[in-house]
Amino acid sequence: MSLLSNMISIVKVGYNARHLQVIVQNSKLCINVLSVLYKLGYIRGFIIKDQKNITILLKYINNKPAVRNIAVISTPGRRTYLKHKKLEKFLTKKDSGFLILSTSKGILTDEESNMFKIGGEALLKIN
């Protein structure tokens, strides 16, 4: 299991158990994804404890998790790459969510990658 998949699994369990914080393994990719989630207001923040661990401060709105659903799209066994023209088709109009992509400009949301007109590896889908 990749570190990103492991982090998402721990975050899901933390939200289901109503924890205020969870601890995950440290990696550059996880820090970049957490930075995007923090910037968009889906977590209260994160603290890099040491070289091995990150504490994620989970966010609740009216006693409900800020993240309704989070899913890993690209796995080590099956990478999913999207061109910027295909991004709109990937999310249906009913979805209020967004994608997090790994691009040549770094970790971006689908809106940001559309602005830059670049595609990339689809990492996560968040509602």
UniProtKB/Swiss-Prot annotation:
Molecular function GO terms recorded: structural constituent of ribosome
Keywords: Mitochondrion, Ribonucleoprotein, Ribosomal protein
One matching Pfam family: Ribosomal_S8
Residues spanning the membrane: none
Domain of life of the native organism: Eukaryota
Coarse class of the protein's main subcellular location: mitochondrion
Keyword Mitochondrion applies: yes
GO biological process: translation
The keyword Ribonucleoprotein belongs to this UniProt entry's keyword annotation: yes
GO (cellular component) term, any one: ribosome
Gene3D superfamilies per record: 3.30.1370.30, 3.30.1490.10
Location of the protein in the cell: Mitochondrion
PANTHER family listed in its UniProt record: 40S RIBOSOMAL PROTEIN S15A
Family: Belongs to the universal ribosomal protein uS8 family.
UniProt-recorded name of the protein: Small ribosomal subunit protein uS8m
Taxonomic lineage of the native organism: Eukaryota, Amoebozoa, Discosea, Longamoebia, Centramoebida
Gene that this sequence comes from: RPS8
